[in-house]
């Protein structure tokens, strides 16, 4: 759907909403919108969102944070895929071994770029909140055993899976939390189980 007679800024906001939601699986916060389109005032963003809602391009639930729905995306055909929820991770055992799978979870296929080699881990704790990953979220992970600096990965440390941002530097691996209250984990080596490709959050 094309926005007619809109300011450039409003078009930028709408395009960012679509891009962010397709990439992350959930809508951006108002502050994230501000940063993306170089606006300092959250009230200005709220004004643009209100006008987009009046045009029927988005729907917002004022009682819930981030509860914003893009009508164009909602009207797309939502093919569902089953992704295994991994309840535990054991060293030396394939991540998708039957005994590791706790349940299956269906999500619209447009929440992820592909449906190959995916699994879900339930997020516990607040060590990644500044990356928008909250306690109770379902982290959608693509199985990979390698990572690039800056990737958010699932790493196996002492038989326990942890979600952190990956950096390899000076012969060591730094697993960096996204919460200033937590210290990074520095190790010589670790097993990379996968890379974060999406977050699913129930409101």
UniProtKB/Swiss-Prot annotation:
Disulfide bonds: none annotated. Keywords: Autocatalytic cleavage, DNA damage, DNA repair, DNA replication, DNA-binding, Hydrolase, Repressor, SOS response, Transcription, Transcription regulation. Belongs to the peptidase S24 family. This is LexA repressor. It comes from the Bacteria. One of its GO terms (molecular function) is DNA binding. Its EC number is 3.4.21.88. Represses a number of genes involved in the response to DNA damage (SOS response), including recA and lexA. In the presence of single-stranded DNA, RecA interacts with LexA causing an autocatalytic cleavage which disrupts the DNA-binding part of LexA, leading to derepression of the SOS regulon and eventually DNA repair. Gene3D superfamilies: Umud Fragment, subunit A (2.10.109.10), Winged helix-like DNA-binding domain superfamily/Winged helix DNA-binding domain (1.10.10.10). Homodimer. Residues 30-50 bind DNA. GO terms for biological process: DNA repair; DNA replication; negative regulation of DNA-templated transcription; proteolysis; SOS response. The gene is lexA. The record marks 91-92 as: Cleavage. CDD domains: HTH_ARSR, S24_LexA-like. It holds the Pfam family LexA_DNA_bind. It catalyses: Hydrolysis of Ala-|-Gly bond in repressor LexA. It comes from Clostridium perfringens (strain SM101 / Type A). The active site is at 127 (for autocatalytic cleavage activity), 164 (for autocatalytic cleavage activity). PANTHER family: LEXA REPRESSOR, LEXA REPRESSOR-RELATED.
